[in-house]
Amino acid sequence: KIYKTLLDIPEERLYITPNGVNTEAFRFTELPIFGHHSIYLAKVDYRKRQHLFQSIKTLYFAGNIADDKFDIETNYLGEWSKEYLYENLTEYGNLVLLSDGEAHPLVIMEAFAAGLGVVISEFATANLDVSKEFITVIPENKIHDIKFVEEQIIKNRDFSINNRHAIIDYSRQFDWVNVIQKHYLPAIQKVIS
């Protein structure tokens, strides 16, 4: 919408490619070690809003710190390397990302590739089938209702733990091979012709 309205670029000249992920890079386990924990994996900054949810006891945080309101003494796991992410993301029950403006964050596709369900803000729903039970969308008008958010995280985690193979199947549409074939190459062909 922004490209069409603010920049006045005609729709036939817009070629938007969704994020893709190397699904084969992620280790998968059916029985995660931290299945009763959720992971909020993102740069810790004000826009990502991690500080709002630190009172949720089963929610753990990973990412580099850029928010002085965030208490690093509460469930903070440090910054993860890509290798650590590939190996360990599958060990959590689900992923939480309640930021205020990312449309199609890569970390969501990474969570799917590791077999995790997601709890996301309404801003992060682009290209997702939100009818899937392992995708929980928190409405913006409920984002400060910590009890509600916690209940939704637990509900999603309980469902996701028992439906990991369905999540892995869903993740395949975001695999780089599929994204390149379905979106990137057709866009290049249109530009060339």
Which residue stretches match the model-derived regions?
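Short alpha-helical donor nucleotide-sugar binding micro-motif in glycosyltransferases
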Residues: 87-92, 184
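Conserved acidic donor-binding segment of nucleotide-sugar-dependent glycosyltransferases
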Residues: 79, 132-144, 153-158
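Donor nucleotide-sugar binding/catalytic pocket of nucleotide-sugar-dependent glycosyltransferases
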Residues: 1-27
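Conserved donor-binding/catalytic core segment of Leloir-type glycosyltransferases
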Residues: 30-48, 54-57
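Short alpha-helical segment that forms part of, or immediately flanks, the ligand-binding pocket
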Residues: 86, 109-113, 127-128
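Short hydrophobic beta-strand element within catalytic cores of glycosyltransferases
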Residues: 117-121, 127
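Aromatic "clamp/platform" in nucleotide-sugar-dependent glycosyltransferases that forms part
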Residues: 100
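A charged, aromatic-enriched C-terminal amphipathic alpha-helix characteristic of glycosyltransferases
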Residues: 141, 157-192
